Swiss-Prot record:
Principal location listed in the UniProt entry: cytoplasm
Keywords: Cytoplasm
This protein's encoding gene: fmdB
Biased composition (Basic and acidic residues): 52-68
Domain of life: Bacteria
InterPro entries: Regulatory_FmdB_Zinc_ribbon (IPR013429)
Any one Gene Ontology cellular component term annotated for this protein: cytoplasm
Lineage, uppermost ranks: Bacteria, Pseudomonadati, Pseudomonadota, Betaproteobacteria, Nitrosomonadales
Subcellular location as annotated: Cytoplasm
Function recorded in the entry: May be a positive regulator of formamidase.
Protein name, UniProt field: Putative regulatory protein FmdB
Organism, as annotated: Methylophilus methylotrophus
Region (Disordered): 52-112
Ranges of Polar residues composition bias in the record: 74-102
């Protein structure tokens, strides 16, 4: 159950733990018992821990902009800083992946 904020005319702002189905209904103030309407407030990001704040930012970015990494088969980042080359077939002189997809193509794997 989420916490909702309500504002009492005499006591001020208070929070209440309520069901989501009761979110739009007014709540009774804990101090005076007066019926109080729900208020909308901004998130408390300023008092949140820096690690939590960065985790929220990271989750927001990953929702529509996933981070991708390009790596080669040798494990380096793709620019071949390790000075290795992909294995070459002795018969065709082409890298192994190209040889496999052309020579032993699988017709049932259309679109892959």
């Amino acid at each position: 159950m989420p916490l909702y904020e309500y504002e009492c005319d005499s006591c001020g702002v208070f929070t209440a733990l309520r069901k989501m189905s009761e979110s739009s209904l007014p709540a009774e103030c804990d101090c005076c018992g007066a019926v109080s309407p729900r208020i909308l407030s901004v998130p408390k990001l300023a008092i949140m821990d820096k690690l939590q704040r960065s985790a929220h930012e990271r989750n927001e970015k990953s929702a529509n902009e996933p981070r991708t990494a390009r790596r080669s088969s040798c494990g380096c980042t793709g620019s071949h800083t390790c000075k290795t080359k992909p294995p070459v077939n002795q018969d065709t002189g082409k890298p192994g992946l190209q040889m496999q997809t052309k020579k032993t193509a699988r017709p049932w794997m259309v679109g892959h």
